[in-house]
A protein has these predicted regions:
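Contiguous, well-folded functional domains in the mature portion of proteins
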Residues: 1-209
């Protein structure tokens, strides 16, 4: 039996309105059932979790999310040090599952409460609710930050310190879109720029030096 490619966090959003829609339809209340059926179908799309053919690229840093690159900027990260940040905006139509950009040991996570500004706004990086995942690879450190937005109000990180992740492996999701930032060491040969579309676990953001 083929497993439906749906993130497990999505099932409550699919099953609950689906049951209500079915019950109303059986009662002959089709007009009332329609919005619940639409919500269930929309959630099927929102929480889809397709399999990905992860490329084997020596030194490659894979995109941790599907979406559009907002910016590529030099900055500082408390775990990585001097870094380049690739900010990726996820719309509600994108796949919301996050994947590890490198094969690594989870060195730590840090969660910060915050606001729910539009994720594409520059101040969302520091002001919004977020969860940072610090990854220790064989030769480099990388940080991935999940950032909530206007629609996304729930960050899910399934891993913790000491866990091991393969490159492209799922580690969490942001419900209903938002933003994911990837911090790589300065000197990384970044291969994307603002405006590019990227695919989580497949697009190579850059090559570690």
């Amino acid at each position: 039996m083929t497993k439906l490619p749906i993130a497990r966090e999505g099932w409550p959003f699919i099953v609950a309105p689906g049951i209500v829609a079915a019950g109303l339809a059986l009662m002959g209340r089709r007009a009332l059932a329609a919005p619940f059926a639409a919500a269930a179908l929309a959630s099927l799309g929102f929480f889809r979790d397709p399999e990905r053919d992860v490329p084997l690229v020596p030194g490659g840093v894979l995109s941790p999310a599907d979406g559009r690159v907002l910016s590529v900027e030099e900055t500082e990260d408390r775990f990585v040090g001097p870094a380049v940040r690739v900010a990726i905006f996820l719309s509600p139509l994108d796949v919301h599952v996050n994947r590890s950009p490198i094969a690594a040991l989870v060195a730590g996570t840090s969660y910060s409460r915050g606001r729910f500004l539009a994720a594409y706004r520059p101040e969302a990086e520091d002001a919004n609710e977020r969860c940072a995942l610090h990854l220790q690879g064989d030769s480099a450190r990388v940080t991935v930050v999940q950032i909530a937005g206007v629609v996304a109000r729930r960050i899910v990180c399934r891993v913790g310190p000491g866990d091991k992740l393969a490159a492209g492996e799922r580690f969490g999701m942001i419900r209903f879109g938002s933003r994911t930032d990837c911090y790589v060491p300065r000197g990384t040969d970044v291969r994307v720029r603002a405006g590019d579309r990227v695919t989580g676990g497949m697009t190579v953001l850059g090559l570690l030096s």
